[in-house]
Amino acid sequence: MDPNSTVSGDGQATAAIEHRSFARIGFLGNPSDVYFGRTISLTIGNFWASVKLEPSEHLVIKPHPFHDLVQFTSLDHLLNRLQNEGYYGGVRLLMAICKVFRNYCKENDIQLHQANFSLSYDTNIPRQTGLSGSSAIVSAALNCLLDFYNVRHLIKVQVRPNIVLSAEKELGIVAGLQDRVAQVYGGLVHMDFSKEHMDKLGHGIYTPMDISLLPPLHLIYAENPSDSGKVHSMVRQRWLDGDEFIISSMKEVGSLAEEGRTALLNKDHSKLVELMNLNFDIRRRMFGDECLGAMNIEMVEVARRVGAASKFTGSGGAVVVFCPEGPSQVKLLEEECRKAGFTLQPVKIAPSCLNDSDIQTL
Protein backbone atom coordinates (compact mmCIF):
# COMPACT_ATOMS: atom_id res chain seq x y z
CA MET A 1 0.00 0.00 0.00
CA ASP A 2 1.08 3.57 -0.60
CA PRO A 3 3.06 4.76 2.43
CA ASN A 4 1.04 8.00 2.61
CA SER A 5 -2.27 6.19 3.09
CA THR A 6 -3.89 4.84 6.22
CA VAL A 7 -6.64 2.24 6.57
CA SER A 8 -9.58 2.13 8.95
CA GLY A 9 -10.73 -0.96 10.77
CA ASP A 10 -13.14 -1.89 7.97
CA GLY A 11 -10.38 -1.79 5.36
CA GLN A 12 -11.23 1.63 3.93
CA ALA A 13 -8.46 4.12 3.17
CA THR A 14 -8.88 7.29 5.24
CA ALA A 15 -6.07 9.44 3.83
CA ALA A 16 -4.74 10.36 0.42
CA ILE A 17 -3.16 7.64 -1.71
CA GLU A 18 -0.66 8.56 -4.42
CA HIS A 19 1.13 6.38 -6.94
CA ARG A 20 3.61 7.00 -9.72
CA SER A 21 3.95 5.01 -12.91
CA PHE A 22 7.04 5.53 -15.02
CA ALA A 23 7.62 5.95 -18.74
CA ARG A 24 8.81 2.80 -20.45
CA ILE A 25 11.35 1.90 -23.11
CA GLY A 26 10.86 -1.09 -25.36
CA PHE A 27 14.43 -2.38 -25.36
CA LEU A 28 14.19 -5.39 -27.68
CA GLY A 29 11.47 -7.32 -29.48
CA ASN A 30 8.87 -4.62 -30.06
CA PRO A 31 6.43 -4.59 -31.79
CA SER A 32 6.12 -8.39 -31.59
CA ASP A 33 4.10 -8.22 -28.35
CA VAL A 34 0.88 -7.95 -30.35
CA TYR A 35 1.95 -10.81 -32.63
CA PHE A 36 2.55 -13.55 -30.01
CA GLY A 37 6.22 -12.57 -29.77
CA ARG A 38 8.69 -11.74 -27.01
CA THR A 39 10.03 -8.44 -25.71
CA ILE A 40 12.32 -6.92 -23.11
CA SER A 41 11.22 -3.57 -21.66
CA LEU A 42 12.24 -1.27 -18.85
CA THR A 43 10.77 1.63 -16.91
CA ILE A 44 12.73 4.86 -16.66
CA GLY A 45 12.84 7.38 -13.83
CA ASN A 46 13.26 10.33 -16.21
CA PHE A 47 9.50 10.71 -16.70
CA TRP A 48 6.38 9.58 -14.87
CA ALA A 49 2.68 10.05 -14.33
CA SER A 50 1.26 10.37 -10.82
CA VAL A 51 -2.30 9.84 -9.67
CA LYS A 52 -3.70 10.97 -6.33
CA LEU A 53 -6.81 9.47 -4.74
CA GLU A 54 -8.47 11.26 -1.83
CA PRO A 55 -11.56 9.99 0.04
CA SER A 56 -14.49 12.33 -0.67
CA GLU A 57 -18.27 12.61 -0.34
CA HIS A 58 -18.85 12.28 -4.08
CA LEU A 59 -16.88 10.46 -6.74
CA VAL A 60 -14.97 13.20 -8.55
CA ILE A 61 -12.60 12.99 -11.53
CA LYS A 62 -10.58 16.22 -11.46
CA PRO A 63 -9.42 17.73 -14.76
CA HIS A 64 -5.75 18.69 -15.00
CA PRO A 65 -5.24 22.49 -15.21
CA PHE A 66 -3.04 22.13 -18.33
CA HIS A 67 -3.73 18.77 -19.97
CA ASP A 68 -7.52 19.15 -19.71
CA LEU A 69 -7.65 22.85 -20.51
CA VAL A 70 -11.13 24.23 -21.28
CA GLN A 71 -10.47 27.98 -20.97
CA PHE A 72 -8.50 29.81 -23.66
CA THR A 73 -7.34 33.38 -24.30
CA SER A 74 -8.60 33.36 -27.88
CA LEU A 75 -9.84 31.22 -30.74
CA ASP A 76 -6.26 31.01 -32.06
CA HIS A 77 -5.07 29.83 -28.64
CA LEU A 78 -7.65 27.03 -28.76
CA LEU A 79 -6.64 26.17 -32.33
CA ASN A 80 -2.92 26.01 -31.53
CA ARG A 81 -3.62 24.00 -28.44
CA LEU A 82 -5.61 21.37 -30.34
CA GLN A 83 -3.04 21.17 -33.13
CA ASN A 84 -0.20 20.58 -30.67
CA GLU A 85 -1.90 18.60 -27.91
CA GLY A 86 -4.96 17.02 -29.50
CA TYR A 87 -8.44 16.81 -28.02
CA TYR A 88 -7.77 14.42 -25.19
CA GLY A 89 -6.37 14.85 -21.71
CA GLY A 90 -6.30 12.37 -18.84
CA VAL A 91 -9.86 12.62 -17.50
CA ARG A 92 -11.15 10.02 -19.96
CA LEU A 93 -8.32 7.65 -18.92
CA LEU A 94 -9.27 7.92 -15.24
CA MET A 95 -12.94 7.35 -16.03
CA ALA A 96 -12.14 4.32 -18.17
CA ILE A 97 -9.99 2.59 -15.54
CA CYS A 98 -12.70 3.19 -12.90
CA LYS A 99 -15.25 1.50 -15.17
CA VAL A 100 -13.02 -1.43 -16.13
CA PHE A 101 -11.85 -1.95 -12.53
CA ARG A 102 -15.45 -2.03 -11.25
CA ASN A 103 -16.53 -4.48 -13.94
CA TYR A 104 -13.53 -6.74 -13.30
CA CYS A 105 -14.34 -6.87 -9.58
CA LYS A 106 -18.01 -7.67 -10.30
CA GLU A 107 -17.11 -10.45 -12.72
CA ASN A 108 -14.67 -11.98 -10.23
CA ASP A 109 -16.86 -11.65 -7.10
CA ILE A 110 -14.51 -9.15 -5.46
CA GLN A 111 -16.51 -7.10 -2.97
CA LEU A 112 -15.86 -3.35 -2.80
CA HIS A 113 -16.86 -0.94 -0.03
CA GLN A 114 -19.16 1.97 -0.89
CA ALA A 115 -16.95 4.94 0.02
CA ASN A 116 -16.26 7.58 -2.64
CA PHE A 117 -13.10 9.31 -3.75
CA SER A 118 -11.61 12.08 -5.88
CA LEU A 119 -8.99 11.29 -8.52
CA SER A 120 -6.46 13.78 -9.88
CA TYR A 121 -3.35 13.29 -11.97
CA ASP A 122 -0.17 14.92 -13.18
CA THR A 123 2.40 13.85 -15.77
CA ASN A 124 5.72 15.03 -17.16
CA ILE A 125 5.96 12.33 -19.86
CA PRO A 126 6.45 14.15 -23.19
CA ARG A 127 3.54 13.72 -25.58
CA GLN A 128 3.83 11.67 -28.76
CA THR A 129 7.22 10.26 -27.85
CA GLY A 130 6.43 6.56 -27.69
CA LEU A 131 7.08 6.46 -23.93
CA SER A 132 3.62 5.20 -22.89
CA GLY A 133 2.25 8.33 -21.29
CA SER A 134 -1.40 7.28 -21.43
CA SER A 135 -0.89 3.84 -19.91
CA ALA A 136 1.25 5.39 -17.17
CA ILE A 137 -1.74 7.44 -16.00
CA VAL A 138 -4.00 4.38 -16.13
CA SER A 139 -1.59 2.06 -14.28
CA ALA A 140 -0.96 4.65 -11.56
CA ALA A 141 -4.72 5.06 -11.12
CA LEU A 142 -5.18 1.29 -10.91
CA ASN A 143 -2.65 1.15 -8.08
CA CYS A 144 -4.61 3.82 -6.22
CA LEU A 145 -7.85 1.85 -6.63
CA LEU A 146 -6.21 -1.39 -5.45
CA ASP A 147 -5.13 0.34 -2.25
CA PHE A 148 -8.31 2.36 -1.67
CA TYR A 149 -10.45 -0.77 -1.87
CA ASN A 150 -7.78 -2.93 -0.17
CA VAL A 151 -7.92 -5.60 -2.91
CA ARG A 152 -4.28 -5.69 -4.01
CA HIS A 153 -3.96 -9.26 -2.71
CA LEU A 154 -7.05 -10.36 -4.70
CA ILE A 155 -5.96 -9.23 -8.18
CA LYS A 156 -2.88 -10.99 -9.49
CA VAL A 157 -0.03 -8.89 -10.80
CA GLN A 158 -0.07 -10.87 -14.07
CA VAL A 159 -3.64 -9.80 -14.92
CA ARG A 160 -3.26 -6.12 -14.02
CA PRO A 161 -1.71 -5.22 -17.41
CA ASN A 162 -4.83 -6.71 -19.04
CA ILE A 163 -7.01 -4.43 -16.89
CA VAL A 164 -4.95 -1.38 -17.90
CA LEU A 165 -5.13 -2.36 -21.57
CA SER A 166 -8.89 -2.93 -21.33
CA ALA A 167 -9.34 0.63 -20.05
CA GLU A 168 -7.41 1.99 -23.01
CA LYS A 169 -9.33 -0.19 -25.45
CA GLU A 170 -12.51 1.41 -24.07
CA LEU A 171 -11.22 4.63 -25.58
CA GLY A 172 -10.19 3.16 -28.92
CA ILE A 173 -6.47 3.17 -28.10
CA VAL A 174 -4.82 0.39 -30.10
CA ALA A 175 -1.89 -1.16 -28.23
CA GLY A 176 -0.36 -4.35 -26.87
CA LEU A 177 0.41 -5.62 -23.40
CA GLN A 178 4.15 -4.84 -23.37
CA ASP A 179 3.92 -1.26 -22.07
CA ARG A 180 1.38 -2.14 -19.40
CA VAL A 181 3.46 -5.09 -18.16
CA ALA A 182 6.53 -2.87 -17.88
CA GLN A 183 4.63 -0.24 -15.91
CA VAL A 184 2.83 -2.69 -13.62
CA TYR A 185 6.04 -4.55 -12.76
CA GLY A 186 8.62 -1.77 -13.02
CA GLY A 187 12.31 -2.32 -13.64
CA LEU A 188 13.55 -4.61 -16.41
CA VAL A 189 11.17 -7.35 -17.58
CA HIS A 190 11.38 -10.14 -20.16
CA MET A 191 7.96 -10.99 -21.61
CA ASP A 192 6.83 -14.06 -23.52
CA PHE A 193 3.52 -13.54 -25.34
CA SER A 194 3.47 -16.88 -27.17
CA LYS A 195 0.03 -17.98 -28.37
CA GLU A 196 0.13 -21.02 -26.09
CA HIS A 197 0.48 -18.83 -22.99
CA MET A 198 -2.01 -16.21 -24.17
CA ASP A 199 -4.67 -18.83 -24.97
CA LYS A 200 -4.14 -20.86 -21.80
CA LEU A 201 -3.50 -18.11 -19.24
CA GLY A 202 -4.97 -15.00 -20.84
CA HIS A 203 -1.61 -13.29 -20.37
CA GLY A 204 2.08 -13.84 -21.07
CA ILE A 205 4.92 -15.14 -18.92
CA TYR A 206 6.65 -12.15 -17.34
CA THR A 207 10.13 -12.52 -15.84
CA PRO A 208 11.75 -9.61 -13.96
CA MET A 209 15.47 -9.20 -14.59
CA ASP A 210 18.22 -7.46 -12.61
CA ILE A 211 18.43 -3.83 -13.78
CA SER A 212 22.20 -3.86 -13.19
CA LEU A 213 22.51 -6.08 -16.29
CA LEU A 214 21.75 -3.08 -18.52
CA PRO A 215 24.57 -0.97 -19.92
CA PRO A 216 24.33 2.85 -19.78
CA LEU A 217 21.57 3.97 -22.16
CA HIS A 218 20.47 7.32 -23.57
CA LEU A 219 17.17 8.69 -24.81
CA ILE A 220 16.68 10.91 -27.86
CA TYR A 221 13.39 12.70 -28.45
CA ALA A 222 12.01 15.86 -30.04
CA GLU A 223 10.52 18.57 -27.82
CA ASN A 224 7.95 19.40 -30.52
CA PRO A 225 7.33 16.19 -32.45
CA SER A 226 6.07 16.45 -36.00
CA ASP A 227 5.98 14.09 -38.95
CA SER A 228 5.75 11.20 -36.53
CA GLY A 229 4.44 8.90 -39.22
CA LYS A 230 1.04 9.85 -40.56
CA VAL A 231 0.36 6.91 -42.86
CA HIS A 232 -1.83 4.14 -41.49
CA SER A 233 0.13 0.89 -41.32
CA MET A 234 -1.16 -2.21 -43.07
CA VAL A 235 1.22 -4.51 -41.18
CA ARG A 236 -1.47 -5.82 -38.83
CA GLN A 237 -3.83 -6.69 -41.66
CA ARG A 238 -1.05 -8.30 -43.67
CA TRP A 239 -0.15 -10.45 -40.64
CA LEU A 240 -3.80 -11.48 -40.22
CA ASP A 241 -3.96 -12.30 -43.94
CA GLY A 242 -1.02 -14.68 -43.57
CA ASP A 243 1.62 -12.57 -45.33
CA GLU A 244 4.76 -14.73 -45.15
CA PHE A 245 7.17 -11.78 -45.03
CA ILE A 246 5.37 -10.09 -42.12
CA ILE A 247 4.92 -13.35 -40.19
CA SER A 248 8.58 -14.35 -40.54
CA SER A 249 9.77 -10.81 -39.76
CA MET A 250 7.70 -10.66 -36.57
CA LYS A 251 9.10 -14.01 -35.47
CA GLU A 252 12.60 -12.67 -36.10
CA VAL A 253 11.88 -9.53 -34.06
CA GLY A 254 10.56 -11.65 -31.17
CA SER A 255 13.68 -13.83 -31.26
CA LEU A 256 15.80 -10.72 -30.66
CA ALA A 257 14.41 -10.54 -27.11
CA GLU A 258 15.58 -14.10 -26.44
CA GLU A 259 19.03 -13.36 -27.82
CA GLY A 260 19.03 -10.10 -25.91
CA ARG A 261 18.29 -11.80 -22.60
CA THR A 262 21.30 -14.06 -23.13
CA ALA A 263 23.46 -11.10 -24.16
CA LEU A 264 22.43 -9.14 -21.04
CA LEU A 265 23.16 -12.08 -18.74
CA ASN A 266 26.57 -12.53 -20.40
CA LYS A 267 27.30 -8.77 -20.49
CA ASP A 268 27.86 -9.19 -24.23
CA HIS A 269 27.59 -5.54 -25.25
CA SER A 270 28.71 -6.04 -28.85
CA LYS A 271 25.78 -8.43 -29.30
CA LEU A 272 23.39 -5.86 -27.82
CA VAL A 273 24.57 -3.32 -30.40
CA GLU A 274 23.84 -5.80 -33.18
CA LEU A 275 20.41 -6.72 -31.80
CA MET A 276 19.23 -3.14 -31.20
CA ASN A 277 20.18 -2.08 -34.72
CA LEU A 278 18.62 -5.19 -36.24
CA ASN A 279 15.38 -4.56 -34.32
CA PHE A 280 14.95 -1.19 -36.00
CA ASP A 281 16.06 -2.43 -39.42
CA ILE A 282 13.44 -5.19 -39.43
CA ARG A 283 10.73 -2.75 -38.30
CA ARG A 284 11.73 -0.39 -41.10
CA ARG A 285 11.48 -3.16 -43.71
CA MET A 286 8.01 -4.12 -42.48
CA PHE A 287 6.47 -0.67 -42.00
CA GLY A 288 8.29 1.47 -44.57
CA ASP A 289 9.74 4.97 -44.25
CA GLU A 290 6.51 6.82 -45.00
CA CYS A 291 4.78 5.10 -42.11
CA LEU A 292 7.68 5.56 -39.67
CA GLY A 293 8.12 9.27 -40.41
CA ALA A 294 11.20 11.25 -41.43
CA MET A 295 11.87 12.75 -37.99
CA ASN A 296 11.75 9.36 -36.28
CA ILE A 297 14.15 7.88 -38.80
CA GLU A 298 16.49 10.87 -38.40
CA MET A 299 16.67 10.27 -34.62
CA VAL A 300 17.89 6.74 -35.29
CA GLU A 301 20.33 7.92 -37.96
CA VAL A 302 21.79 10.64 -35.70
CA ALA A 303 22.87 7.94 -33.25
CA ARG A 304 24.17 5.66 -35.95
CA ARG A 305 26.32 8.43 -37.44
CA VAL A 306 28.49 8.30 -34.32
CA GLY A 307 28.55 4.49 -34.26
CA ALA A 308 25.94 4.05 -31.52
CA ALA A 309 23.17 1.44 -31.53
CA SER A 310 19.64 2.84 -31.73
CA LYS A 311 16.01 1.83 -32.09
CA PHE A 312 12.52 3.13 -31.31
CA THR A 313 11.41 3.08 -27.68
CA GLY A 314 7.91 2.29 -28.90
CA SER A 315 6.20 3.01 -32.20
CA GLY A 316 8.03 6.28 -32.78
CA GLY A 317 8.67 9.66 -31.18
CA ALA A 318 11.75 8.67 -29.18
CA VAL A 319 14.82 6.50 -29.61
CA VAL A 320 16.85 4.47 -27.11
CA VAL A 321 20.60 4.59 -27.71
CA PHE A 322 23.57 2.55 -26.50
CA CYS A 323 27.05 4.05 -26.92
CA PRO A 324 29.38 1.03 -26.55
CA GLU A 325 32.52 3.20 -26.70
CA GLY A 326 31.51 5.15 -23.61
CA PRO A 327 31.67 8.88 -22.69
CA SER A 328 33.67 10.00 -25.74
CA GLN A 329 30.97 8.57 -28.02
CA VAL A 330 28.25 10.17 -25.89
CA LYS A 331 29.97 13.55 -26.41
CA LEU A 332 29.83 13.05 -30.17
CA LEU A 333 26.16 12.09 -29.88
CA GLU A 334 25.39 15.21 -27.83
CA GLU A 335 26.83 17.38 -30.59
CA GLU A 336 24.90 15.57 -33.33
CA CYS A 337 21.64 15.87 -31.36
CA ARG A 338 22.26 19.57 -30.74
CA LYS A 339 22.76 20.18 -34.47
CA ALA A 340 19.61 18.19 -35.31
CA GLY A 341 17.51 19.95 -32.65
CA PHE A 342 16.88 16.79 -30.61
CA THR A 343 16.94 16.37 -26.84
CA LEU A 344 19.36 13.80 -25.39
CA GLN A 345 19.12 12.45 -21.84
CA PRO A 346 20.91 9.67 -19.99
CA VAL A 347 18.39 6.99 -19.04
CA LYS A 348 17.66 6.61 -15.32
CA ILE A 349 16.31 3.11 -14.81
CA ALA A 350 13.34 2.89 -12.43
CA PRO A 351 13.49 -0.27 -10.29
CA SER A 352 10.69 -2.79 -9.72
CA CYS A 353 7.61 -1.24 -8.11
CA LEU A 354 6.14 -4.49 -6.74
CA ASN A 355 5.56 -4.67 -2.99
CA ASP A 356 5.18 -7.71 -0.72
CA SER A 357 1.42 -7.99 -1.37
CA ASP A 358 2.04 -7.94 -5.12
CA ILE A 359 4.78 -10.56 -4.96
CA GLN A 360 2.51 -12.90 -3.00
CA THR A 361 0.04 -12.94 -5.92
CA LEU A 362 2.68 -14.06 -8.44
Swiss-Prot record:
> Which body tissues produce this protein?
Highly expressed in pollen. Detected in seedlings, inflorescences, seeds, leaves and roots.
* Keyword entries, A-Z: ATP-binding, Carbohydrate metabolism, Cobalt, Kinase, Magnesium, Manganese, Metal-binding, Nucleotide-binding, Transferase
Q: Which InterPro entries match?
A: GHMP_kinase_C_dom, GHMP_kinase_C_sf, GHMP_kinase_N_dom, Glucuronokinase-like, Ribosomal_Su5_D2-typ_SF
List of residues binding ATP: P126, R127, Q128, T129, G130, L131, S132, G133, S134, S135, A136
Broadest EC class?
transferase
What Enzyme Commission number(s) does the record list for this chain? 2.7.1.43
Q: Which PANTHER family match?
A: WITH PUTATIVE URIDYL PYROPHOSPHORYLASE-RELATED (PTHR38710:SF1)
> What is the name listed in the Swiss-Prot or TrEMBL entry for this protein?
Glucuronokinase 1
State the encoding gene.
GLCAK1
